[in-house]
């Protein structure tokens, strides 16, 4: 059983000094910089971007509401 390099196996959270374990805006245990594309545009022509403070890839605020 291998342990993820970002994960403290006892606490089941990021190791000390690391930001994250996984997610679209996490790479090498750190949050991706704000403005990094995390989801490329499809039909609407607007990319989604990382915030620099979360592993989530928030929906571009200029896109319409999801159906």
Curated annotation (Swiss-Prot):
Short name of one Pfam family: Disintegrin
Lineage top rank: taxon: Eukaryota
Keywords: Cell adhesion, Cell adhesion impairing toxin, Disulfide bond, Secreted, Toxin
GO biological process: cell adhesion
Location(s) in or outside the cell: Secreted
Keyword Ion transport: no
A GO CC term attached to the entry: extracellular region
SMART domains named among the record's database cross-references: DISIN
Motif (Cell attachment site): 42-44
Disulfide pattern: 6-29, 20-26, 25-50, 38-57
InterPro entries: Disintegrin_CS, Disintegrin_dom, Disintegrin_dom_sf
Domain (Disintegrin): residue spans on this chain: 1-65
Gene3D superfamilies the UniProt entry points to: Disintegrin domain
Location (main, coarse): secreted
Tissue expr: Expressed by the venom gland.
GO molecular function per UniProt: toxin activity
More details: Negative results: does not inhibit alpha-V/beta-3 (ITGAV/ITGB3) integrin.
Family: Belongs to the venom metalloproteinase (M12B) family. P-II subfamily. P-IIe sub-subfamily.
Assembly and interaction partners: Heterodimer with EC3A; disulfide-linked.
Function according to Swiss-Prot or TrEMBL: Inhibits adhesion of cells expressing alpha-4/beta-1 (ITGA4/ITGB1) and alpha-4/beta-7 (ITGA4/ITGB7) integrins to the natural ligands vascular cell adhesion molecule 1 (VCAM-1) and mucosal addressin cell adhesion molecule 1 (MADCAM-1). It is also a weaker inhibitor of alpha-5/beta-1 (ITGA5/ITGB1) and alpha-2b/beta-3 (ITGA2B/ITGB3) integrins. The inhibitory activity of EC3 towards alpha-4 integrins is associated with the MLD sequence of EC3B subunit. The ability of EC3 to inhibit ITGA5/ITGB1 resides in both subunits A and B.
Protein name: Disintegrin EC3B
Classification of source organism: Eukaryota, Metazoa, Chordata, Craniata, Vertebrata
